[in-house]
A protein has these predicted regions:
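Conserved AMP-binding loop of ANL adenylate-forming enzymes
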Residues: 130-176
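Long, hydrophobic, well-ordered secondary-structure blocks that form the structural core
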Residues: 110, 114-120, 246-247, 278
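Short small-residue beta-strand/loop micro-motif enriched in glycine and branched aliphatics
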Residues: 104-109, 368-371
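Active-site glycine/GP-rich loop and adjacent strand/helix microenvironment
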Residues: 1-52, 60-67, 74-82, 169-509
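Conserved helicase ATPase motor motifs in RecA-like P-loop NTPase domains
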Residues: 96-102
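Short alpha-helical patches at coil-to-helix transitions and adjacent helical residues
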Residues: 92, 117, 121-122, 217-220, ...
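Active-site diphosphate/adenylate-binding microenvironment
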Residues: 27, 31-95, 106-111, 118, ...
């Protein structure tokens, strides 16, 4: 029996456990909540919010408020300075650095040892378990896993305490089993300079038998492009004949799918999406033919949801998982084994089915355009761009969009800044198809576009090569888990990028 079959047999029991998601949703989630309450009952937060008196879900909601990062920041700051038993039992030594809030450049998300084991690493194991269950002929453990990560640094110089990208924390604490199959070395994986890291990873990986990839699609594409440059090969399977799967997450895969299809032409190449955020591992594809992800309901995460049409109300409706409806857009609220209590993560999701609960990520609570009542979300944008690319043969590297509130002629429109990997023959046709698709899938956008009365036809501005990388670099955010803001209701991001785009030399285009 080969190594992959041995691993698959070992994980078969876990696949059976996941099958219980079909009829035990409420039971499993209430069990998670009970465990979280019990583990935090003697913490400062637990004592302040009466965890000793919490008997069920209703009593939990009455004693615990919904929180954003700003509400928990003072507690997290104290934890980062070494205080114990604040939001979670014991001392939390690791903090995932995430994109900031209105008031802060960065958020620092606590990652407890319990959160590492029962959420993040469990998610990685389950991704492998479900993939092998769908691909019994897999040979992924015949070779190595190319896993991309960010970097970390000491946390206030406290012993054994780190702050950095979640991926770096996962690599730092990885088991010997994972390290045996993983490349690059930990030293290279945790380098802070992404450009140096990319070069060293590519040089090392080209000599290995890589069978699987894990990382953010945009940064992985950058590394793989360098691998192809060094090797002189046409397709990735010419470098690594055993390549079979890419476990991806962090950003939507849709804009990159065609580029990966051209990079890896083998018909048996698979792509499996995971939803692993700094705050926890929440979902993964259990059917590679279905873009929806399975919500993982027996980890250290208790889920609640706020309908997006309630989000701005003083007392919005909040429902547990078993109270959601399919086809409705929700903001996700989580309570975790790292002390994030009823925490608004900032992501929005839409459920596609129940029992088991499957969903798609539709965007961010703060990444949308609703300047004129059009309520455009990231999922709309991704689907619109996909249609435009398919119709025109274009390929997209990166993009962002924002409203133009009123130009010199008193007209309002959406402005899209797009870096093409392959430009469409007609930018006008591309823009027209994108506009029509957005009207087809978003009735609010369609209404505002009616006869150009409220909203004019969208505008597309081609970005020079590497504009978005350069913008991230100017923010000290090149590489790792940093992402381009896809949609914004203000012009802050796009104006900065347009300024960099306008100052480019002709050869940059």
């Amino acid at each position: 029996m080969n190594k992959t079959k041995l691993v698959s047999c070992f994980l078969s029991g876990r696949r059976k456990s996941i099958s219980k998601y079909e009829n035990q949703t409420e039971e499993l989630q209430l069990n998670v909540l009970h465990k979280l309450i019990c583990q935090a009952i003697h913490t400062e937060w637990g004592q302040t919010h009466g965890f000793a008196q919490v008997k069920d879900y209703d009593s939990f909601t009455k004693t615990s408020p919904v929180n954003t990062y700003e509400e928990l920041k003072s507690y997290i700051d104290r934890m980062r300075h070494g205080e114990k038993d604040v939001l979670w039992s014991g001392q939390v030594r690791w903090y995932a650095k995430s994109s900031g809030t209105t008031n802060d450049k960065s958020k620092f998300i606590p990652v407890s040892k319990e959160c590492l084991q029962d959420t993040h690493y469990r998610g990685g194991t389950d991704a492998v378990a479900l993939y092998l269950g769908q691909n019994p002929r897999s040979r992924m453990f015949d070779g190595k896993a190319l896993i991309l990560g960010g970097s970390h640094s000491p946390n206030y110089n406290l012993p054994h305490s780190l702050v950095g990208d979640l991926s770096a924390i996962l690599i730092e604490n990885a088991s010997p089993f994972v390290n045996y199959f993983r490349i690059p070395s930990k030293k290279v994986a945790l380098l802070g300079d992404f450009e140096e890291k990319r070069e060293r990873i590519a040089q090392a990986a080209i000599r290995e038998n890589v069978t699987n990839l894990s990382g953010v699609p945009s940064w992985m594409l950058s590394v793989l492009t360098r691998v192809m440059d060094i090797s002189g090969k046409t397709h990735l399977e010419d470098v690594w004949p055993g390549i079979e799967v890419f476990f991806h997450g962090g950003v939507a895969f849709t804009p990159y799918r065609e580029q990966y299809r051209q990079l890896v032409t083998a018909s048996d190449m698979h792509y499996m999406e995971t939803y692993n955020a700094s705050e926890g591992f929440f979902g993964l594809q259990n059917d590679l033919q279905d873009r929806s992800m399975l919500l993982m309901i027996d980890y250290g995460v208790f889920y609640e949801f706020i309908p997006m049409d309630e989000i701005d109300k003083e007392n919005p409706q909040i429902v547990p998982l078993w109270g959601v409806e399919t086809g409705k857009n929700y903001a996700m609220v989580i309570s975790t084994s790292a002390g994030l209590w009823r925490y608004m993560i900032g992501d929005t999701v839409k459920f596609t089915q129940k029992d088991p609960y499957k969903f798609i990520i539709t965007g961010r609570t703060k990444f949308f355009i609703n300047a004129f009542g059009e309520e455009l979300i990231v999922d709309n944008a991704e689907n619109g761009l996909k249609a435009a690319c398919e119709a025109t043969g274009a390929q997209i590297r990166e993009y962002t969009a924002a409203p133009v509130y009123m130009d010199a002629h008193g007209k309002c429109r959406h402005q899209w800044l797009i870096e093409f990997a392959k430009e469409p023959e007609s930018l006008t046709d591309f823009a027209h198809i994108l506009d029509l698709k957005l009207q087809e899938i978003n009735s609010d956008y369609e209404a505002k576009r009616y006869k150009d009365i409220t909203l004019q036809h969208l505008e597309i501005i081609p970005a020079r090569k590497h504009l978005f990388d350069d913008w991230l670099k100017s923010k000290g955010k090149l590489g790792g888990q940093h992402k381009i803001p896809r949609l914004s209701n203000t012009r802050t991001y796009i104006d900065e990028m347009l300024s960099m785009n306008d100052s480019a030399k002709p050869e940059d285009f």
